[in-house]
Amino acid sequence: MSLNLEQARSALDTPFVLDLNTPLDLWLREVNTVTGPGQAFSMIFRTAPEPVLPQQTYRLRHETLGEQWLFLVPLTVDSESAVYEALFNN
């Protein structure tokens, strides 16, 4: 299922869980509209700095949105957190 802007905004400040050896919570901190055709937007996630996730598609679970496959791009990583972005063009 592809997310729309309204669904993404409803999930602000809630975790998406990535199942690794130890589950990793990615907290949705921003939903921003972007220039593009249709209803383009980005989702910005913040999580622990380790493990560093390479750019690729991940299966994430959300309490109300269910399972989502998102292509995550690392934006920044420092000693306190890592920030990732997913872009949508609906």
Task: Give residue ranges: language-model regions.
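Surface-exposed, beta-sheet-biased, low-hydrophobicity segments with strongly acidic/polar composition
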Residues: 1-90
